[in-house]
Amino acid sequence: IFSHSFIGHDTTLDHFCYVANNVSMGAFIKVNEGGYLGMNCTIRERIKIGKWSIVGMGSVIINNINNFSVVAGNPGIELK
């Protein structure tokens, strides 16, 4: 977890998660094993990030993310 990141209450990070600078996370978020959150991304409350998924920098996540996905944009869409 890098500097200036905000993690809301009741949020869970599994093993091997990476949270870059300036990430903002709402409450009740679940980041599964190996989740990667790029710089300046924003994640809405009650979101689940799948195993080994990548959230691109500057993305705004408003929907759950499947396992092994790459998501980017505002709003975040699955690229792979």
Outline where the language-model segments fall.
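Structural signal for interior beta-strand "rungs" in well-ordered beta-sheet cores
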Residues: 1-72, 76-79
